[in-house]
Curated annotation (Swiss-Prot):
This is Small ribosomal subunit protein uS19. Pfam families: Ribosomal_S19. InterPro entries: Ribosomal_uS19, Ribosomal_uS19_bac-type, Ribosomal_uS19_CS, Ribosomal_uS19_SF. The keyword RNA-binding applies. One of its GO terms (molecular function) is structural constituent of ribosome. Belongs to the universal ribosomal protein uS19 family. One of its GO terms (biological process) is ribosomal small subunit assembly. Protein S19 forms a complex with S13 that binds strongly to the 16S ribosomal RNA. PROSITE patterns: RIBOSOMAL_S19.
Length: 92
């Protein structure tokens, strides 16, 4: 269920401070974060945010279409390598 509109978007304060600092300085370096639960807000547009996926930080370039989504949606945590091949079919 989506979050109530009267509550507003959730964003971790430490991430918000990092984003505001990056916007002020105009720094193009990725903002590193472990906060996958934070929502993307308009001040993050045109920033690269490195979101942790459990193993490494995945760079995510924020565009206007992403506003309202969570950061974790753009950094997949699971890798699919395909099902095991059928040994009988391989021999033929």
């Amino acid at each position: 269920m989506p979050r109530s509109l009267k509550k507003g978007p959730f964003i971790d304060l430490h991430l918000l401070k990092k984003v505001e600092k990056a916007v002020e300085s105009g720094d193009k370096k990725p903002v590193k974060t472990w906060s996958r639960r934070s929502m993307i807000i308009p001040t993050m547009i045109n920033l690269t945010i490195a979101v942790h996926n459990g193993r490494q930080h995945v760079p995510v370039f924020v565009t206007e279409d992403m506003i309202g989504h969570k950061l974790g949606e753009f950094a997949p945590t699971r890798t699919y390598r395909g099902h095991a091949a059928d040994k009988k079919a391989k021999k033929r």
